[in-house]
Curated annotation (Swiss-Prot):
Reaction equation(s) it catalyzes: cyanate + hydrogencarbonate + 3 H(+) = NH4(+) + 2 CO2
Name of the featured protein: Cyanate hydratase
Pfam families to which the protein is assigned, alphabetical: Cyanate_lyase
GO MF, any single term: cyanate hydratase activity
GO annotation terms (biological process): cyanate metabolic process
Zinc in keyword set: no
Active site residues per record: R103, E106, S129
Documented EC number(s): 4.2.1.104
Lineage top rank: taxon: Eukaryota
Alphabetized UniProt keyword annotations: Lyase
Its job: Catalyzes the reaction of cyanate with bicarbonate to produce ammonia and carbon dioxide.
Family: Belongs to the cyanase family.
Length: 163
């Protein structure tokens, strides 16, 4: 399960993350697991798994038990650290400075109104949910050997109510 590319955490760069982030990332690094490795073992999507590590998603009791087992973290500690509700949206300053996260921000800056226009034409007046939502990341390699990142966003369409 050991991989060359391993996401780790420099807590000095992320002052707003919860204590659970440090616990989870330290155990992840010690075992040299990727988010894909962990997600397969706990039965979650790898982006959802990473979101738990960054304090941006709620871990179920089953998630907590599975993470404790897979990462060899005391269950009681994880239960204490992951029992609350996430304080979403505080982990990234705006605009973001980290280049990859900034590129995602830039995509919304450049194409946000285009997405909105096309979505409104297809679905009517409303929004795409980020709560009834799923996402995944895939890697594609073209015929020339170039690697492409494919990010799929899937959100329930919520029409605005007339009142």
């Amino acid at each position: 399960m050991s991989h060359l590319n391993l996401a780790t955490l420099d807590t000095s760069q992320h002052p707003y993350l919860p204590a659970s982030s440090q616990t989870l990332f330290a155990a992840k690094a010690k075992r040299k697991f990727t988010f894909e490795d962990i997600s397969k073992q706990i039965g979650r999507n790898e982006v959802a798994t990473a979101a738990i590590f960054y304090g941006q998603a709620k871990a179920s009791a089953e998630d907590i038990a599975n993470l404790a087992k897979v990462l060899d973290i005391p269950l009681k500690l994880l239960e204490e650290q992951l029992s609350g509700f996430p304080d979403r949206g505080r982990s990234v300053e705006m605009p973001p400075k980290e280049p990859l996260i900034y590129r995602l921000y830039e995509i919304v800056q450049n194409y946000g109104y285009a997405y909105k226009a096309v979505l409104n034409e297809k679905f009517g007046d409303g929004i795409m949910s980020a709560i009834s939502f799923s996402t995944k990341v895939e890697k594609e390699t073209d015929a020339d050997g170039n690697n492409w990142a494919v990010i799929t966003l899937r959100g329930k369409w919520l029409p605005f109510s007339r009142f």
